Amino acid sequence: MSLPSALLPTAELHYQSLISEHPHIANWPSSVLNQLRYVLGLSQFVAQTLQRDDPLCQVLPSLLAKPSREQYYRSELAQWLAECQDEAVAQKRLRQFRNQEMVYIAWRDFCASWTLEESLSHLSQLAEALIFESYQWLYQRCCLEMGTPCNAQGEAQPMLIIGMGKLGGGELNFSSDIDLIFTYPENGETQGARRSIANAQFFTRLGQRLIKLLDQSTPDGFCYRVDMRLRPFGDSGPLAMSYAALEDYYQEQGRDWERYAMIKARVMGREMYPQYQELRQMLRPFVFRRYIDFSAIQSLRRMKSMISSEVRRRGLSNNIKLGAGGIREVEFIAQVFQLIRGGREPSLRKRGLLETLDAIAELELLTREQVQDLRDAYRFLRRLENLLQAMADKQTQTLPDKEDDQLRLSIAIGLADWPSLQREVSEHMQRVHRVFATLIGEEDEEEEHTVARHFHELWDMAHKPEVIEHIIEQDLGLSDAGEQIRTITQFKDDLAKRTIGPRGREVLNRLMPKVYQAVFAHPDAEFGLSRVLALLHSIATRTTYLELLDEHPAALVQLVRLCTASPMISEQLARYPILLDELIDPQHLYNPIPLESYQTELRDFLARIPEEDMEQQMEGLRQFKQISILRIAAADIAGVLPVMKVSDHLTYLAEAIVEAVVSQAWLQVSSKYGEPTHLKHRDGRGFAVVGYGKVGGWELGYNSDLDIVFMHDCPVEVNTDGEKSIDGRQFYLRLAQRIIHIFSTRTASGILYEVDTRLRPSGASGLLVSPTDAFDEYQRQEAWTWEHQALVRARMIYGDAPLQQAFANTRHQILCLPREEHKLKQEVVEMRIKMRDHLGGKKAGRFMLKQDEGGITDIEFLAQYLVLRFSHQQPKLTRWSDNVRIFESLMNHQVMSESQALALTHAYTSMRDQIHRRNLLNQSADVRDSQFVVEREQVIQAWQQWLG
């Protein structure tokens, strides 16, 4: 074994660093030292682990003297844990054992000492040992603390841990998560403790502690990322369920993908449980149907479509697992035969994929050549996946971009260079995809209608303007086609200059006639054509998106409809093409998330992203916002949502995002400094976000900023409880700074929101986060009238109950202060004149909907003035922060006549609706001055009555 010259400096650097830190390594046997240099050149994980783990360096040569270690895992780990007196020590020992054995496995893999089967078996047996022995150790401790869980007959009940996916199949990869399900035979209560608890409660607590023992990141690392989402009802389901509850769920609610997942299910340490056979017999009918079940093909086809969508969404390329012909397609091929015929053919009920392929060959369900292609590809790709992950102990299936890593991977797999590896990967994946396409691939469905010949010619003959002119004027019956001709010919010319591969060109040849047919079927084709082609130009080199539109006619129809109606939407889709997936299902597209569900939907959306991956969490927030706004705008265009409801949706979306941003920021800041100690004596975080202006008034538009103010109730003497303790108020300052950072950072998906915090006490020169008492004092002693006007439109959009109450009290009391009428009127009018002079319309013949006389800002100032003037007489006027309900309240309390309140409300909502429409068209907020004449006159009359 030798390294190429390009990798020798890195290997030597790691070697010298190790010798310096652990001099005894120089005494290792020469054969082991030779292997050491080789492995150090290939694996940063091995180098870093040995560097910090001297006990491992002491024993590694003796470990490597054994050709196999899986038979020792359980017994050795049980001895290690027997010496542990508490969970902190157990966590440390488990991680040390895991690191020791993973170095051993990586070493064997890089030195090509094992077959793939030996490597996967060691990885799976190691995981099973860590899971099962941790459970055994914890179960004894929990029984001492809470009593032993028993059934009605007094028989002790164990918790069975079902390993899913590759863990269950004995095919775990190097840096895999582990998917688990917890179950127990019977309900009952604990016995032997001072207070009995239900078995369900016992096993839930046990499960929580087991997850923490394995999953929590410590200075020694972690054992495994534990994923419990495959359990019944997912994240919302109980952590542990009885056999009876499990059986009810799978019989009544089990879905196709759960059948797919359950094929590989295996109980950890199953030989220890007499109850195992009962569980196995219970689950078998759900997984394997007695009849031949061809519906499995369609189910797997849908799952493959979902995976393809995720590949597009995440921008994955060179992915040997999820890409076309990757590991997942080999697994799907095996699964389809298991699901279709496993009920009748016991030989197809194997958990391991290679065993299943053997059975498929024996039953002649595929040709011997096809099975051999699948077997060879699977072995190669799985070994490549393990080596890729063992380089840095990272969970990835994407081939590296860096040249050094490309060379490392090529050498590790036994090839001379990167091009050789690329060829080998490509050949294997092409063979797999051919079998997959034959067996599971999309059925060739006839199009609902044939695309007319002239739409093919619009694409094929685009280089001949005279042909295009004839088609548009004669075949399509459109006059004045000059602009469309230029658009079509320029689009084809531009694409000719782009680097688009053969596959992309082939898709464009199929897609473009369909695009032209859909565009020219629309009455506003002159708008839609340029917008749709501009979008296609932006995604022309991203073949997966072109294929999406080609394969989903409904998505293409929606694309044309939305782009024709709104340049804002077409630009958004062009900038962020992952949104194209949302067009596939029109029923979903035109039904925005229910108002009360935005927070839940956002949490679910972010749950698929590792909590510690802050960059992807930020990206996820932006993607969720874009998807949600697309659905809101689509419903708006379709007339499903009136303008008030559009603003409601945009506001509830913003509130959900604020809550998620605060949670992310809190996690980041508290992990560094701990939490302020005063929180131990109260619920919540002691922090609030107050929304002003449009977000405060439930009146957000598509392009609105967020005007926000931060508050806390932290006492002066409080510090945080982390190792790096800081002053409590300093903690909240850093929290607010982190929140602004998350909102404002420009990622691949842009910024989240523009945020403005200048409405805080003392403006830009004031504290970024105001203590509640200081906020109250400022409002009473120092605030200007315009700041009290702003308070009319303020409400808390995030915060716990004590802060909610404190802010509500301050706002109510300030707004109810008696004010001298003349002075109030003068200050409001002066501020309005100043704003109009600064922001009002300068265009002749145009009316600025917001700032000109008789516009929206005049209406808002009227509402604020009347609340400030009359709330000391009518305190209930302070209840609402939105203008529509303020006018309703003014009418109900006889401050304003019904006719005037309704007229102002109508003027306000009509102008806002026009601004929404113009936002969708990317137009400025001004109209011809012949519009809204009656409404403006009514606003001016009201202004003269109250403020003239």
UniProtKB/Swiss-Prot annotation:
Domain of life where this protein originates: Bacteria
Keywords tagged on the record: ATP-binding, Magnesium, Multifunctional enzyme, Nucleotide-binding, Nucleotidyltransferase, Transferase
GN (gene name): glnE
Ranges for region Adenylyl transferase: 452-948
Catalytic activity: [glutamine synthetase]-O(4)-(5'-adenylyl)-L-tyrosine + phosphate = [glutamine synthetase]-L-tyrosine + ADP; [glutamine synthetase]-L-tyrosine + ATP = [glutamine synthetase]-O(4)-(5'-adenylyl)-L-tyrosine + diphosphate
GO cellular component, one term: cytosol
Native species: Vibrio cholerae serotype O1 (strain ATCC 39315 / El Tor Inaba N16961)
Lineage summary: Bacteria, Pseudomonadati, Pseudomonadota, Gammaproteobacteria, Vibrionales
Protein name, as recorded: Bifunctional glutamine synthetase adenylyltransferase/adenylyl-removing enzyme
Keyword Lyase: no
